[in-house]
Amino acid sequence: NRQESGNRTAPSAMNRQDVKIYICTKNASYLYDHKAHAMIPVNDGDVRPADAPICLILVTDTAEPWAAMDAGIVSQNISLFCSGTGLATYPRASMNKDALAKTLKLTSLQTPMLCHPVGYKK
């Protein structure tokens, strides 16, 4: 994100900026607040759907017509950043979405769209 302007790095359809990023670690889950550049605690415990040190869960509002496309744009930015900094990641859609939605305290209109396990290259 661009702290100087408050804008996000990834564009979105009609500038909706509806993709929420949750950071899941071994000990807790957080919601990333892009305006404050802060991680807001959501819960304790390990809910990572993969074994990587962290998993980034991209959550979208299913009422937004461009939600899947916006999640794809954010996903590409995550992949490019990780590649450029020597980290390993890959986007995946396979995860227990119902369990994650409950654990992350999502609304009925929000859904986990993509997961990015992030770790070190082997």
Give the role of each language-model region.
Residues 51-54, 109-111:
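Short coil/turn connectors at secondary-structure junctions
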Residues 4-7, 89, 111:
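Secondary-structure transition/capping residues
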Residues 26-28, 35-37, 61-63, 95, ...:
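Solvent-exposed coil/turn segments that connect beta secondary-structure elements
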Residues 46-49, 80-82, 114-117:
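Glycine-rich loops and low-complexity Gly/Arg-rich segments
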Residues 41-44, 71, 108:
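Generic structural "secondary-structure junction" signal
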Residues 1-52:
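N-terminal amphipathic, basic helical "cap/leader" segment at the start of enzyme domains
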